[in-house]
From Swiss-Prot:
InterPro entries: NqrA (IPR008703), NQRA_2nd (IPR056148), NqrA_C_domain (IPR022615), NQRA_N (IPR056147). Gene3D superfamilies: 2.40.50.100. Belongs to the NqrA family. Its EC number is 7.2.1.1. NQR complex catalyzes the reduction of ubiquinone-1 to ubiquinol by two successive reactions, coupled with the transport of Na(+) ions from the cytoplasm to the periplasm. NqrA to NqrE are probably involved in the second step, the conversion of ubisemiquinone to ubiquinol. It comes from Neisseria meningitidis serogroup B (strain ATCC BAA-335 / MC58). The keyword GTP-binding does not apply. The keyword Translocase applies. HAMAP family: NqrA (MF_00425). This is Na(+)-translocating NADH-quinone reductase subunit A.
Amino acid sequence: MIKIKKGLNLPIAGRPEQAVYDGPAITEVALLGEEYAGMRPSMKVKEGDAVKKGQVLFEDKKNPGVVFTAPASGKIAAIHRGEKRVLQSVVIAVEGNDEIEFERYAPEALANLSGEEVRRNLIQSGLWTALRTRPFSKIPAVDAEPFAIFVNAMDTNPLAADPTVIIKEAAEDFKRGLLVLSRLTERKIHVCKAAGADVPSENAANIETHEFGGPHPAGLSGTHIHFIEPVGANKTVWTINYQDVITIGRLFATGRLNTERVIALGGSQVNKPRLLRTVLGAKVSQITAGELVDTDNRVISGSVLNGAITQGAHDYLGRYHNQISVIEEGRSKELFGWVAPQPDKYSITRTTLGHFLKNKLFKFNTAVNGGDRAMVPIGTYERVMPLDILPTLLLRDLIVGDTDSAQALGCLELDEEDLALCSFVCPGKYEYGPLLRKVLETIEKEG
């Protein structure tokens, strides 16, 4: 077992009950274009078109052959675009059960599939988009080969679902999905799980299981990659989430694209935090209807540390998100708040009484408690960064855009989620995720 000591388990109220309930009926789903780094769509549908589940909606011009398919049947209700015509979302009004059928295989045939058969079925169904590269966190080219594939079967994000609960319901599909991935490449398939977690595996020669323990970010793929198979400019691995492995197993067994998602609905503003069964790209406001405390709330697709605000054209469950988090908007200001003992506020430093209340869960809000200021290196980054890098120096380089130094310090190993805790504890109120993405784009473009 690999056990990390540095990190932070956020003591946030509203942890979900680890039992799966059926979610509300969903009448709108969408694909969010801005989730896919560097993607430039070539649209295959227009508003008003009828589509089947599994039908191609658009293709990536920059990554030919990579297609994005409909998560449900219905009609194209809207195609939202932002500045410079950036694709924001393709919205489908759900109607009927029409679907496209893909190749299916008998269970005993899965172990003999060729890599080309696996690749073709994943690409045609749109499940190729479940894979992401590291470095750069982009969808791999259809003819690319990884050094390894990392299956993330754990989650240490605040308010997250316990993957073992979800995998237990679909253990055979998960095992079939692992077997399919083992046929995609001859390289290692690293299945990463929490210490002592009951996660099934397959006996394929290239599948290895690893256990991780410790606080968040022990459950992030970036942490797993760093300790098992570090990447660099000339070494790429792929990552995939456990729920997508289940979906792949179902696709190859049935020939049908199953877009079911089990998500955690949690946070201090949720009346009954629990796990809900819904669909990929579901309209978030329909999921949360009647579920929230009647105040000014911020609804987030994903983790409170690194999720996306859901509103307007973005009011949909993200492709790579397994949770919806809800916290209160922090719009009020406090007079001389820094003088008060503040037992109801959490701080990683010893600046509030709440820091010393070890077993208390706090009702967090969106207030940042101060304005923008200079980056202050007081050791907080080092306390939450378990990777063997120099976080203060790296974060400084991200701020000034020094790509050469950032690359030398290990930025190619990282994704936005890997720096979310650094943003949370930053006295200067910097958001390091967008800064990292900007530097990665520059490195990819200019070298």
